Amino acid sequence: MTIPKTHPFPFDPTYGMTLDTLCAIVPPEAPPGFDAFWQKRYKRALTIDPQPALKQSNLTHPAWQVLDITYTSTDDVTIGGWLLLPRDAPVRRGLVVGHGYGGRDAPDFDLPVEQTAILFPCARGMSRSAQAPIPPDAPGHVLHNIDSPDDYVIGGCVEDLWIAVSTLQALYPWLANRIGYIGGSFGGGLGALAIPFDNRIDRGHLIVPTFGDRKQWLTLPTVGSADSVQTYQKTHPDVLDHLRLFDAATSATRIKVPMLVAVALFDPAVAPPCQFAVANAVPPLKYNEIFILDAGHFDYPGMTEQNFALREKLRGFLKLHEPGISALA
């Protein structure tokens, strides 16, 4: 392992924990009404007609046709993003790809998938989905309506992902039950909240997911989005009561589809105990796997090799359980 030994942070991004202690972390119990809260939101999201609109993008790629896309989400929010379609193969799979709290300025052309329509939505309030009065920056975004669970922006972002699935099915009806999800950091936490309540998503890949074990998330020092919420908590001590409904680890215990979760031993932006709370919460089914990274949100020796190994692991994961179909995503 090549866990970073030197860094510029005024705290230890390993939090003094070893792989063994991280793997022993258990998810928090669900607050009363957790399932009903999310089931109600999902039911509402299913009533939305996404009305996708497509146009040719200025971006080009030899393997992918690149389209700009917008669709309508809950609260009449317009979500913008990109849709990639294979140039020389049929569309037999769908994939929704989330993003980190830095937003997204372009699609990722290097995902190891084939015969797949890939939708890259921008979360409400960010990048192509900028929406006043939602702050576009991570410290402000994560606080938007935080004291009102029904209106908290994170719930809306989860709904945006569900409606991304609806959008793919509206465009390609034959993709029903053949749509996967990938998300890292912010997008990883959203995925853990979204996947268990949407049975149209057939598997997921989460990378260094945030929002796990909110009590710890509000306690451990960080340079990530939790920092602004920790500051807010000093004058609003009941914020944890609201955030327990948005705990990615609690939600992950309800996941029933194959999962590949990559978590880091060192991470200044998403504390490893919070990441492992999510990964450990995923039920230990046959095709579920945890992939260990030496670090997240930080460059380190061996990072290129580990990222390549994870990419190859993802390639295989996306092909599982698919006789006669070359890619699952």
Descriptions of predicted regions:
Residues 1-64, 326-329:
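N-terminal targeting or regulatory segments adjacent to alpha/beta-hydrolase or S9 domains
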Residues 81-85, 90-102:
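Short beta-strand element of the alpha/beta-hydrolase
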Residues 106, 110, 117-159, 217-218:
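Cap/lid segment of the alpha/beta-hydrolase catalytic domain
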Residues 255-256, 261-263:
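Short beta-strand/loop motif that positions the catalytic acidic residue
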Residues 142-185:
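Gly/Ser-rich "nucleophile elbow"/oxyanion-hole loop immediately N-terminal to the catalytic nucleophile
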Residues 5, 276-329:
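C-terminal catalytic histidine-bearing segment of alpha/beta-hydrolase fold enzymes
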Residues 190-235, 302:
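Hydrolase active-site cap/lid region
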Residues 265-270:
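Acidic catalytic loop of the alpha/beta-hydrolase fold
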